[in-house]
Amino acid sequence: MSRIALGLAYDGSAWQGWQTQPHGVTVQDQVEAALASFAGGGGPVATVCAGRTDTGVHAAMQVIHLDTDLQRRDESWVRGVNAFLPPSIVVQWARPVSEAFHARFSARSRTYVYLLWRGRVRPALWAGRAGWAFQPLDVPAMRAAARTLLGEHDFSSFRSSQCQARHPVRTLHRLDIDERGAFLVFTLRANAFLHHMVRNLIGALLQVGQGRESVAWMDALLRARDRRLGAPTFMPDGLYLSAIEYPAEFGFDELDGGTMLLSPFTGALG
């Protein structure tokens, strides 16, 4: 039995999140069915992922692992599994890893990118793939509010009531807000994220950007540790799992899908 890691990308618009659900069609369902077909239909295949994305959330870089007796070249895994996947899900790479590697528990950090379209009307060509705000936004105020969130904190004010995490303390290493033409690009990196944490952070930052709340409110909200005081959970459309960081001992290059994700913004929109 050997352990294989695979890197995935997917458009989450058509799927009810990553994780298998009793009455839903999920990315995990599709991937495990494709793996079973590639393996010859010898039984179910179980996978573990780096980050469980919600309904409508995308991935430019999702990492999974599975244990298997099947021996194939790396490129055979990529081409073979992709042959059984729908167009909105793709295996980008595959490689053997040691039994010490765990897609979820070995990860040092995850990075999410949120694409927000600023315009009078919603972006038809980005439907399902970008969030939308039609009100003017005070970006400097949003950046000031974002700085109050950096570091290790209890993020209870930004976790959903369905969150199953054992504790709400997370370390937010990065929260950048970049202007790219009509888009705002939010980049968030943390050791791990709570359920709906990114979308709740975006929702709160938009409250500040729209002038409904002050920069000081963000700090007070963080300290309150009460989700009921926070902003509504923002739409999933523009959210992408974009990078996973693992210790050097596992021999991965930087697993960052951000270059592919942000390539449309290079040049004319940069």
UniProtKB/Swiss-Prot annotation:
PANTHER family reported for this sequence: PSEUDOURIDYLATE SYNTHASE (PTHR11142), TRNA PSEUDOURIDINE SYNTHASE-LIKE 1 (PTHR11142:SF0)
Gene Ontology biological-process entries: tRNA pseudouridine synthesis
Name of the protein in its database record: tRNA pseudouridine synthase A
GO molecular function terms listed in the Swiss-Prot or TrEMBL record: RNA binding; tRNA pseudouridine(38-40) synthase activity
UniProt entry tagged with the keyword Transcription regulation: no
Organism: Bordetella parapertussis (strain 12822 / ATCC BAA-587 / NCTC 13253)
Record: active site: 54 (nucleophile)
Residues involved in substrate binding: 112
SUPFAM superfamilies, per database record: Pseudouridine synthase
